[in-house]
Amino acid sequence: MTTVTMRDMLQAGVHFGHQTRYWNPKMKPFIFGARNGVHIINLEHTVPMFNEALAFISNVASKKGKVLFVGTKRAAGEAIKESALSCDQYYVDHRWLGGMLTNWKTVRQSIKRLKELESQSVDGTFDKLTKKEALMRTRELEKLEKSLGGIKNMGGLPDVLFVIGADHEHIAIKEANNLGIPVVAVVDTNSAPDGVNYIVPGNDDAMRAIRLYTSSVAAAANSGRGQDLAVQAEQDGFVEAV
């Protein structure tokens, strides 16, 4: 099972919160103290809370559940996309479109259009169009890919949201809450943990910290999928009892 240690978190700078003047009092239980005007997060809380979240994600993945990685802050986008792809899951790394979950019917139509344009771009359809029309469709394709590329193969609502930066992604969290989708989120000292089922108190800006979170969640999802594949193989008679 995937777990993260205190040392991992210290090396990644997970314990560095925001300046004390920007703090959210709702995060008080998770703050150790302050140093040079910056809040220090109590990793005695973060380590077990993150490991509990990883166990939950692994369990979801073991039941063929879908994990949606969400991180649209500049520092998070690349890590979110890479980690989601590394475990065959889904991501939103550019901008959260209002209604992405709660208005799934409309989003599904946009995904259908994206796939149509993808087909047209490779089957020669674009070549038969005027330059202007081809350019317009290319731009439409790029825009849709940027917004929906990470969820185009999700095939329905996710089973859990993993979020970097609860404050920044509050719309995504609210939509998940409205639909009863569990939320795992990294919550910094300037944010409110409202609507988060699995709170991970930690730095949500430092690249090393973000990569630690995303790679650990990907490893947990892969671990869960491995269990699922092992069970499936046993059911199919591929694994003989020793």
UniProtKB/Swiss-Prot annotation:
GO CC, any one term: cytosolic small ribosomal subunit
GO biological process entries: translation
Recorded coiled-coil stretches: none
Stored Gene3D superfamilies: Glucose-6-phosphate isomerase like protein, domain 1, Helix hairpin bin
GO molecular function (one): structural constituent of ribosome
Keyword NADP applies: no
Ribonucleoprotein found in the keyword field: yes
Family matches, as InterPro entries: Ribosomal_uS2, Ribosomal_uS2_bac/mit/plastid, Ribosomal_uS2_CS, Ribosomal_uS2_flav_dom_sf
UniProt cross-references to SUPFAM superfamilies, sorted A to Z: Ribosomal protein S2 (SSF52313)
Record keywords, A-Z: Ribonucleoprotein, Ribosomal protein
PANTHER family: 30S RIBOSOMAL PROTEIN S2 PROKARYOTIC AND ORGANELLAR, SMALL RIBOSOMAL SUBUNIT PROTEIN US2M
Recorded family membership: Belongs to the universal ribosomal protein uS2 family.
UniProt cross-references to HAMAP family, sorted A to Z: Ribosomal_uS2_B
Name the record gives this protein: Small ribosomal subunit protein uS2
UniProt organism field: Shewanella denitrificans (strain OS217 / ATCC BAA-1090 / DSM 15013)
Source taxonomy: Bacteria, Pseudomonadati, Pseudomonadota, Gammaproteobacteria, Alteromonadales
